[in-house]
């Protein structure tokens, strides 16, 4: 069995299977909030500046995940910068998703885990890229 498993080739680009859908979700959410208005911020009872950072943070994090992956794709394209952009984008995603979960005012941690699956998955996706960067 060990020999069989060793014959299966590694797929070093598998991080794109997580990177692209996560980036697309955040780019879509960011674009949907533009133009940023105070009325939209008031719907969620947020200050305008927080709403502005959320909108452009979502857009920037999505673009950063794609850009960071491209920058780290080759040694000629400054791989350390790609890693840094990927980590920052993952951190941004984690911060935004923490805020989204927090605004929902869950009664308990268990309620978040059981009923807020989508946001939890996005949070863990951001955490993955914040911790691993482009070294996947």
Task: Give residue ranges: language-model regions.
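Membrane-interface interhelical connector segments
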Residues: 34-48
